[in-house]
Amino acid sequence: RDGRLDVVFCEARENAVVWLRQQSPGVFVETRLAEKMSAPVHVQAADMDGDGDLDLVVGAMGVVFPNNDRIGTVFVLENDGQQRFTPRAVLENTTRVTDVRPADLNGDGRLDLVLGQFGYDQGEISWLERTGPWTFRRHVLLELSGAINVGVADFNGDGRPDVAALISQQWEEVHLLLNDGGGRFTPSRIWGSTNEDYGSSGLVVCDLNGDGRPDLLHSNGDGFGPAATPGPRPWHGVQWQENLGGGRFRHHRIGNLPGAYSPIAVDVDRDGAMDVVAVAAYADWNNANRRVVSLMWFRNDGKQTFEPRVLARQPKDLITLAAGDFDGTGRVSLVTGGFYIYPPYDALSRVTLWQPTAP
C-alpha cells in the first residue's frame, strides 16, 4: 500500500500466482507468490482476516481443459503485513472453480466467498459462509454446469447483496439470485441465448448508464465451443443488461467483437460517460492481411449508443483486461493478459500495460 497500483495475475499453465509490484512509476518487479496451485484462473485482493492487510483470494480449476473430476480448490493467500503470503486452502475436492468473489452475504460483518464452479457435466454457483477465522460452510445456490463469472451487488435495492452469474456450456444464460436474508436466495434467469455455440466468456457488474443501479456487462467470445473448428464466430460481441429496478433487466447489444472476452466499463475519454472496453481471445489469424482486433473500445456518446473503435490489433489472444490510474495522473491505463493455445505463435505478450497517449 505505497499509493502505486500493482498487478496481480494467475499463470494457469504454470500453476502460479504472480505479483507485479510497481516499484517506481512505470517500473514493475515480479514476485511469484504461489507456485503449487493447480490451474489458478482468478485472483482478487481483499482483507479476509480483518488485520488491515490485503490478502489474495484465488480460484483454481485443477486443469483448464474439460474435466469432470472434483479437482477445484479455493485458496486464500494470507498476507502477514510484510508482503509474505501463506496459502490456505478453504475449499478442496470440489468441481472446477472459475471465479471467487469476497462479499458479506449474510450481514454478520465477516467476508464470505461467492463461487462460480464450471465443473463440466456438473457445476454450481455456491457461497462459502464464514464460520471461523479460516473455516467456511458451503451452500449451493444453483446447480448448472458452465459457470464463467459471478458478480455481487444489491440489484433490487433492498439493502442486501445479491448474486449474478454467467453460465456457458449448453445453457448460455445470465442468472440472478436475489438475497432474501437469512442465507436464502431466490433464483431467476434474466437472459438467455438459444445458440448453444454462443460462447459466453465474461461478466462484470457496473453502472453503465449512471442511474445508480448496478447493471451487467457480459461478453460472448469463447472459441472452443461444440463446433469442430475453434476460433472466432460472427455473433461474438458484448452485451449490456440494463437494470430497470426490482430485479428486472433489459438486454442491449453493445457491439460485435470476434473472440470477445473480459468486458469492463471505464470512462476512456473522460467525457463523463462510461465506455466499454474488451479484449479478443480468438481472431482469424489465418486471414491473409491479419486485419484482426485484439483490443476494442466501444465509445459511449452519453446516450448509451456505442461506437466501436479499434485500440490495437496485436498482441494476439488476449483473455483478461483491467483498468486503473497507474501513473497518478487521473488518466485511465489498461492492463491485458494473454493465453496462448493455438498458432501462430507470434505477436505474443504475457502482460501488457497500455497507457493513454492523449492528455
Residue ranges of each PLM-predicted region?
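Beta-propeller-forming repeat regions
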Residues: R1-P359
